[in-house]
Amino acid sequence: KSSGICGSDVHYIYHQHRATAAAPDKPLYQGFINGHEPCGQIVAMGQGCRHFKEGDRVLVYHISGCGFCPNCRRGFPISCTGKGKAAYGWQRDGGHAEYLLAEEKDLILLPDALSYEDGAFISCGVGTAYEGILRGEVSGSDNVLVVGLGPVGMMAMMLAKGRGAKRIIGVDMLPERLAMAKQLGVMDHGYLATTEGLPQIIAELTHGGADVALDCSGNAAGRLLALQSTADWGRVVYIGETGKVEFEVSADLMHHQRRIIGSWVTSLFHMEKCAHDLT
């Protein structure tokens, strides 16, 4: 019924066709139907399926893991280390087609209040932002900084607002993204990434720095900005993919008692929880 196009799709389709260490025999996008953000309705069931029925509206967790490695047991097939790991639309057929063959263990029931388009967003982009919000432990007492206002960054601000964050600050290279965030009502203060002295500006605005900084840019400068703009004892969550970052371990991290957390997509449990939280 619906299948989204992710930023990672654009990156790999146009810039990087390759196999992964987890699936060296299955190069990305080679010989497979694309679409790793699928959401639809079950029209037929295979033998042995017990948890769903024909007619159910479901979203598909976009990685099918082995089901037995420690990460799969934790509910994170995205980090599967076993044999047979394959992403829908990357190493097995995905959602950009009339029908999709999915495994029952990868399905999540779509709440009645949500559309198929909502489900497609949750199956990757919103779920990724949601996990970052959880890892950062965002609450109503927090000043939250989001660096990189693409789809995931926008969703992170939306979710932070939904959790009652005290103040939400956005940073991006593009003024039109800042304007959109302001128009949507998910951002209290916005700055261009080229603004001089941003860490000091954010420190003054928040009386000490962001309690939680979420980098959704995947950019070295963005990651450094997120770290340096975080308050003492604050949490920095790196969500954006690829790239590198360099910083002074003592001056930028240890002496400020800051904590860096890596967050990659989300778990099956949290994706289901995200869907219900959005109703």
Region locations from a protein language model:
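Glycine-rich beta-strand-centered segment in the early N-terminal region that forms part
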Residues: K1-G4, R18-P70, D106, P111-A113
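Generic hydrophobic/aromatic pocket-lining and core-packing "Φ" positions
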Residues: D9, M157, L178, R223-L227, ...
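Phosphate-binding beta-alpha-beta segment of Rossmann-like dinucleotide-binding domains, i.e.
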Residues: H62-A97, D118
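Mid-domain Rossmann-like dinucleotide-binding core that forms the NAD(H)/NADP(H) cofactor-binding site
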Residues: K105, D112-T195, Q200
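Glycine-centered, small-residue-biased loops immediately flanking beta-strands
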Residues: D142, G234-R235
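C-terminal substrate-binding/catalytic core of Rossmann-like NAD(P)-dependent dehydrogenases/reductases
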Residues: P199-A203, H207, T242-T279
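Short SAM/SAH-binding signature in class I
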Residues: G208-L214
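Helix-to-beta-strand junctions that scaffold the AdoMet/dcAdoMet cofactor pocket
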Residues: T230-A231
